[in-house]
C-alpha cells in the first residue's frame, strides 16, 4: 500500500510523528482485507495486538510517498506474526530517487473471542488470506 505524508502526519520539526508509522502499518493491514471484500474480524472474534517491535531508521517528511510492505513471519493456530517495512519511494519534489527504509516492525496478533477475550483459532478464511500475502 502507498500513502503520502500530509501536515497532519508530522510533528513540529516537519517529520512524521513516530506513532503514525504504526497507523500506516495498520492501514496497510486493513486495506489488505478490504481489497478481498472481508473485514479483519467476524462474529466470533477479532485480531488484537499482543506485541510490537519497532525500528526507526530515517524520518519521513511532508509530501513524501511511502510504501508499506507486509510479510508473514509466522502463522499459528491462534496468532500471526507480521513483518512490516515502510519505504520512502518518492520525495515531495517528484524527482526520481532511490527508495530508502524509514521504519520496520514485527507485530504479533492474537485472535480472540469478542466476549471473553480468550484466544480462539484463527478462522480458515483469514488463514487462507494471510497465507496469500
From Swiss-Prot:
EC number: 3.1.2.-
Keyword Repeat recorded: no
Highest rank taxon of the organism: Bacteria
UniProt-listed InterPro entries: 4-hydroxybenzoyl-CoA_TE, HB-CoA_thioesterase_AS, HotDog_dom_sf, Thioestr_dom, YbgC/YbaW
Pfam families found in the cross-reference section: 4HBT (PF03061)
MF terms (GO), sorted A to Z: fatty acyl-CoA hydrolase activity
SUPFAM superfamilies in the cross-refs: Thioesterase/thiol ester dehydrase-isomerase
Gene3D superfamilies: Hotdog Thioesterase
The entry's keywords: Hydrolase, Lipid metabolism
Enzyme's top EC category: hydrolase
PROSITE patterns given in the database record: 4HBCOA_THIOESTERASE
Biological process annotations from GO: lipid metabolic process
Catalytic residues of the enzyme: 11
Coiled coil: none
Similarity field: Belongs to the 4-hydroxybenzoyl-CoA thioesterase family.
Free-text function comment from the UniProt entry: Thioesterase that may be involved in phospholipid metabolism. Displays acyl-CoA thioesterase activity with lauroyl-CoA (C12:0), myristoyl-CoA (C14:0), palmitoyl-CoA (C16:0), stearoyl-CoA (C18:0) and benzoyl-CoA, catalyzing the hydrolysis of the thioester bond. Has low activity with butyryl-CoA and octanoyl-CoA.
Quaternary structure and partners: Homotetramer. May interact with CagA.
Name of this protein: Acyl-CoA thioesterase YbgC
Highest classification ranks of the organism: Bacteria, Pseudomonadati, Campylobacterota, Epsilonproteobacteria, Campylobacterales
Gene name for this UniProt entry: ybgC
